[in-house]
């Protein structure tokens, strides 16, 4: 019975993560495509000319959503794996005596003066679980990420994802499907860790403000959703600004692995050829996309989990 319950909850976290990831990736694909194009080369690609080029093409709408399938697969299943592993890590860490002792001063259990149904951890716990979960999910989804970047870019003339994958394996071997993983991990681990840290801190502070305004009454569902959305957007903006250089390097490595080789060589070449500015290429687009996608994904995920937790609690009462 316990195993069945845990399995169903794990499955639901996977489904909730998948749903939230698909929603954000499909809606915000144009911003992701523009970011990839802008990061190709700081000298030849800037935002306005890139937009004009796409809009002047025979199929502008299709052009803006080019690469939606690999992006949706990557973000959808990546989010599913990330949220599932993040929940497992947070649940496990929250149950240890050391974590409980560290988090005791800020933990309030499942109180609805919080906007979240997720376990409360210390700052280091939030940082570590976010980084580990994102790195693991990123490794599993790396081949899809490489396909997405190559397909979105105008460096290649791939007509389908199959032809892209076949060409990469033929010319670069299976290793080519993991191009840029070092830079991706260097970007995603600190980004995810910082994001979860900022997100939880912002939620806690905003929830305290909202609960005081509601005279100690439980938070309304609309208040919880608003708190999660605002916290997600702000946390993503902060974490994105800090880690953008890794994203710019990752894009170059995935587009031209033969030229750039590794992270250190890529950084040197980018600065030599395009200046320090190249490390911050696409920052505005990435902040916009990350803020919106994270706000949407985490709000949808948290809302689904809150509703599921309420139903599971009611079911447990009935079973008793």
From Swiss-Prot:
Single GO term (MF): glycine transmembrane transporter activity
Key words, A-Z: Membrane, Mitochondrion, Mitochondrion inner membrane, Repeat, Transmembrane, Transmembrane helix, Transport
Recorded topology in the membrane: Multi-pass membrane protein
Protein purpose: Mitochondrial glycine transporter that imports glycine into the mitochondrial matrix. Plays an important role in providing glycine for the first enzymatic step in heme biosynthesis, the condensation of glycine with succinyl-CoA to produce 5-aminolevulinate (ALA) in the mitochondrial matrix.
KW Mitochondrion (keyword) present: yes
Swiss-Prot/TrEMBL catalytic activity: glycine(in) = glycine(out)
Origin: domain of life: Eukaryota
Species, as recorded: Aspergillus fumigatus (strain ATCC MYA-4609 / CBS 101355 / FGSC A1100 / Af293)
UniProt keyword annotation of Nucleus present: no
Sequence ranges of the Solcar repeats: 8-92, 121-205, 223-307
Main location, first listed in the record: mitochondrion
TM stretches of this protein: 14-39, 67-93, 127-152, 180-203, 227-253, 282-300
Subcellular location: Mitochondrion inner membrane
Family recorded in the similarity comment: Belongs to the mitochondrial carrier (TC 2.A.29) family. SLC25A38 subfamily.
Name of this protein: Mitochondrial glycine transporter
GO biological process, alphabetically ordered: glycine import into mitochondrion; heme biosynthetic process
Cellular component aspect of the GO annotation: mitochondrial inner membrane; mitochondrion
Species lineage: Eukaryota, Fungi, Dikarya, Ascomycota, Pezizomycotina
